[in-house]
Design a protein with these regions (language model features):
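Structural beta-alpha unit
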Residues: 1-2, 76-110, 147-150
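General small-molecule cofactor/ligand-binding pocket signal
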Residues: 36-38, 86-90, 141
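Acidic, proline/glycine-rich short linear motifs
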Residues: 40-69, 149-150
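Glycine-rich, Arg-bearing micro-motifs that act as flexible, cationic patches
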Residues: 109-131, 149-150
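Short, flexible loop segments at boundaries between secondary-structure elements
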Residues: 140-146
């Protein structure tokens, strides 16, 4: 098995991201790697451009607080498994934030789900995963969540 020092896990709080986090925790335990958990968000420009709406700072603050709390919950899962880690919260397009964070922190591996909370369906991969694979400075391991029992 490869020896990893730093593993980046982009999290959007979907079931696919949860599955990726579980796998990343196992890989980190086996290799002694540190986890970097990243959540990136942005307001779609179509909302502000089409309606000329300025989003109140209190709304942005609420988004940041909720995301920070969810990131800390994810980090607590890693720490409970004996894995060290840190969190990153960025306001940027997700794939760009993933690639930039991976480069800045000299990440050895990105582990991410193939679909998130975008609501868009792509034939094989979600758009963020697909773009990340193309621009990432390191290997990207993608996985899909287990199908839900019917």
């Amino acid at each position: 098995m490869a020896h990893f020092h730093r593993i980046l896990v982009p999290v959007d709080f979907s079931k696919h991201a949860d599955a990726a986090l579980d796998l990343a925790i196992e890989l980190a335990k086996e290799s002694g790697a540190e986890l970097h958990l990243l959540h990136a968000y942005e307001l779609p420009s179509s909302v502000t451009m089409a309606y000329g709406v300025a989003i109140p700072q209190s709304v942005w603050d609420g988004v940041q607080e909720a995301a920070t709390a969810k990131l800390e919950e994810a980090l607590a899962r890693a720490k409970a498994a004996g894995v060290a880690g840190t969190t990153h919260l960025l306001t940027a397009p997700a794939a760009d934030a993933i690639a930039e964070t991976a480069a800045a922190h000299k990440v050895d591996l990105i582990v991410m789900g193939t679909r998130g909370l975008t609501g868009l369906r792509h034939v094989l991969l979600g758009s963020v995963a697909e773009r990340t694979i193309r621009i990432a400075p390191c290997p990207v391991l993608t996985l899909k969540a287990k199908p839900e029992a019917s």
